[in-house]
Design a protein with these regions (language model features):
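Conserved alpha/beta enzyme-core scaffold
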Residues: 1-156
């Protein structure tokens, strides 16, 4: 489903609202692919820094090709300083505009953490967990959307 070279944009602002489970599994998949000699790296764009499963685990699995706009993760910094990850550090307020202007090419995936959903006949409503970040931009730009349901958060 997620392919080598895909650009992914995520919900959240700092670890709040970041999808977590998908990236724990994606880093495991990357390790298996690399062990089999198959390349696998993705680009990750967020509204701020993210969490260990997105930055640290993915960097340790050598599954990150590019990351922007900001990181506070020690494991990610280590791999970036080794030259394993291309990284762009910028003012967080510029990210959504740069996405809309196409600075990062096409966004294959928007990955959004939600606390619940309501399905209707003509529309669906997704309830974000604790922080949206750049969600309104990424869901419009992405070719495909993955929704990660975090049941720890109450949708009400």
């Amino acid at each position: 489903m997620i392919n080598d070279g895909d650009m992914m944009a995520l919900s959240g602002f700092t670890p709040n609202g970041n999808p977590k489970a998908i990236f724990r599994e994606l880093s495991k998949r990357a390790i298996k692919l690399h062990d089999a000699g198959i390349p696998f790296q993705v680009g990750i764009l967020t509204g701020a820094s993210s969490c260990q499963s997105v930055e640290g685990d993915m960097a340790a699995a050598k599954a990150l090709k590019f990351r922007a706009p900001f990181s506070t993760n020690k494991d990610f910094r280590t791999h970036t300083n080794l030259g394993e990850v291309d990284y762009e550090d910028m003012h967080l307020g510029h990210m959504a505009e740069r996405l809309r202007r196409g600075f990062y090419g096409e966004i294959e995936w928007a990955v959004v953490e939600v606390s619940g959903m309501e399905e209707g006949e003509s529309e669906c409503k997704a309830f974000l967990t604790s922080a949206g970040g750049i969600v309104s931009t990424i869901v419009r730009l992405a070719k495909k959307i993955i929704i990660e349901h975090n049941q720890f958060h109450n949708p009400n």
